[in-house]
Amino acid sequence: MPKDIPILDVFQPGLKRGAERLAFAPHKRYFYVEHPTEGWRVYLRACCFLHEAGVPVKKDRFLVVKRFGSNPSAKSWEPPKGQMEGKDGLRDPKQPILQLLEENVQREVEEEAKIKEILQLRHTGLVLQSQEKDYPSNHFFQYHVFQGFVTPQEIARAADEFKWLHDHPKAWERMRKDKREKDDLTWFSPTKTKMMGRWSPSLIVMYMGDKSV
């Protein structure tokens, strides 16, 4: 991505909203906002760093999930994250973008980490903006970084749900694909939970290095 492109303001009024199929998942339509005169387009993504509730926050102690069926020792872990689909972003054209992002990240956390109750969920103000290799020059994506807290009881319940699913493989098979993308949950460790993909390592460096959150 060109170095001189600032973080584009996806919260400003007057942006067009739409959805488009992308090459990596052509069976889905992904939500975007587009500037009516400048022409840039941003696909919206969200990532959530979940800490244990009721104890002092340690920036390097957050929950990560493992890619379904992968070797736990491989680069197969990441914080819960995902990209907003058109069916979610276009339901109400007047719904604020921040609210859409909050709903999106809660949905991703429930699908990937089996966590249903997040306390004090908030947008950290951190945004990772970049481009995929097949994007046109004026198309971008943004990861909006959220922070939340989870009780030990909710973490234990989610872990039990993963255990039950491992013990009942036919139940896994019956689940929608987007609900079985991940199959384990644990605390981040720089040596034991190696990060997958292009963007998870950058998101972690951004989050852990920012002193304002």
Map each language-model feature to its residues.
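Short, P/G- and charge-enriched loop/turn segments at secondary-structure junctions
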Residues: 30-39, 132-135, 170-175
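Conserved beta-strand and immediately adjacent loop positions that scaffold enzyme active sites
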Residues: 47, 61, 184
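Conserved Nudix-box catalytic region and its N-terminal flanking loop in Nudix hydrolases
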Residues: 57-111, 115
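A short coil-to-beta-strand element that immediately follows conserved catalytic motifs
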Residues: 116-127
